[in-house]
A protein has these predicted regions:
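"A position-specific structural signal for the A-helix of alpha-solenoid helical repeats
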Residues: 15, 22, 58, 65, ...
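Terminal, low-structured helical/coil segments at or just beyond the last alpha-helical repeat
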Residues: 114-162
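Flexible helix-coil transition and linker loops at the boundaries of alpha-helical arrays
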Residues: 7-12, 45-57, 92-96, 118, ...
Length: 162
């Protein structure tokens, strides 16, 4: 069988709840963020209502990916909430960093510094995050700003269906 055929068989063997999450992941990969968020919300609702035994890893990864979708739409408050919930489920360095980056982007430097202190972020991780934030903030604007804005607007409408 082809690898595609095997992938489809493996997909079909997954529980319905896992297939829904995979669909959300696929939509994020293809920049269909609003649809992905809706699928993730349905998946979380199904997980709660059906008391599925998928565990905190599964729930945390849904919240993380939903946070990424919201962040891609520049809806940082929603992203922040999702990343916080993801970190509560996952308790990983990566999930903590995503949450702290969202704090920085939505609430600013002071809130970020305060949260790093509250969460007792170690010095090495803090330096690494500060460096990544500095790099992320060094954006070069395109030479033809009008053309770039038109392209970005077109891309946003394509990704949101608006």
């Amino acid at each position: 069988k082809s690898s595609l055929g095997l992938g489809i068989v493996r997909f079909e063997e997954q529980p319905e709840i896992v297939r829904k999450k995979i669909k959300g992941d696929y939509l994020v990969d293809h920049e269909k963020y609003i649809n992905a968020i809706q699928v993730y919300q349905e998946t979380l609702k199904d997980t709660e209502e059906n008391e599925t035994n998928m565990g905190s890893q599964f729930t945390g990864s849904i919240y993380n990916n939903m946070g990424c979708a919201y962040a891609s739409l520049f809806q940082m408050n929603e992203a922040l909430t999702c990343f916080q919930k993801a970190n509560e489920e996952l308790h990983t360095k990566a999930s903590l960093k995503s949450w702290l980056f969202a704090v920085y982007m939505s609430k600013g430097q002071d809130a970020y510094e305060q949260m790093c202190t509250e969460r007792k972020v170690d010095a090495e991780t803090k330096r690494e995050m500060d460096r990544q934030i500095t790099e992320a903030m060094q954006v070069e604007l395109p030479h033809d700003l009008d053309e770039a804005l038109t392209a970005w607007t077109r891309e946003y409408h394509k990704n949101t269906g608006l």
